[in-house]
Amino acid sequence: MTAFQQLPSSVLQTGAIFLSIIIEALPFVLIGSIVSGLIEVYITPDKVYHFLPRNRWGRIFFGTFVGILFPSCECGIVPIINRFLEKKVPSYTAVPFLVTAPVINPIVLFATYSAFGNSFHVALLRALGSILVAVILGIFLGFFWQEPIQKENRLACHEHDFSHLSPAKKVFQVFVQAIDEFFDTGRYLVFGCLFASIIQVYVPTRILTSISATPIFAILLLMLLAFLLSLCSEADAFIGASLLSSFGLAPVLAFLVIGPMLDIKNVLMMKNYLKARFISHFITIVTLVVLVYSLLIGVIL
């Protein structure tokens, strides 16, 4: 009898679920890391600023939807937003990009589609929720917020300029950046997969049923879970899909929408660059909009 055979069946089941989730998620994390490396090396804020529309509404919607063309993982989105703001990209363009870029890009949408059994339904609802939050934040910043959102004496950060490198060195730097992002993201993915597998095996079904019977409590619980786990947007759909049978669509949708825009690591990074007053408004607006959106989806569907 091997050492594995001597383990309790619950431990073996947890391990099997953990491996199945992480094996599904890793290819998308790898692709996302490579794309992020390409953006870091080849796409500069100056290039983005060149394409900005002239009117305020156009800039809000530009920031909301440009993430389709420039997919960015939320793990590195905050420093990118800081660079945009330093290049005089308005906050009502930069912040919507912060919210939607990790969600509406093709990689994350396809990962969500795959995680939920090749269903466009959840991927579409996730994208719509993200767009709704982005537009509301853009309107708030564009028409009601009157001050800069950056810290006046923000912490200095080390920023890379790759423009002077030869083509071969740029390609090398793409892979350097991608490897850094892959391993940085991987640690969060491991904890998320482990947590999801433990819930499925060790938390009694009656407890999950009682939680899911109260929609607002289930939604708030999974929103908190998304905040604490700090998962990468290329991988969180697989965690969400594993929780679907226990909590239902609306709470899982809240988990998927809020995770890329509001988690521990993002808030900590925001504190380096952005004013505390803005961060508190950002957290409040995002939380309320995602909560109301998820409740409405639960009622309608």
Go through each PLM region and give its residues:
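Membrane-embedded helical hairpins/re-entrant loop segments and their flanking transmembrane helices
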Residues: 35-66, 208-213, 239-240
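Short helix-loop boundary/capping segments at the starts of domains
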Residues: 24, 28-31, 40, 44, ...
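Selected transmembrane alpha-helices and immediately adjacent juxtamembrane segments
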Residues: 2-34, 46, 50, 124-223, ...
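Interfacial helix-start motif at the membrane-water boundary
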Residues: 24-25, 63-69, 228
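Structural signal for the C-terminal ends of transmembrane alpha-helices
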Residues: 38-43, 202, 264-265
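Short glycine-rich loop/turn motifs that provide flexible caps or phosphate-binding loops at active sites
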Residues: 31, 62, 66, 75, ...
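Membrane-interfacial helix-loop connectors
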Residues: 70-128, 203-274, 278
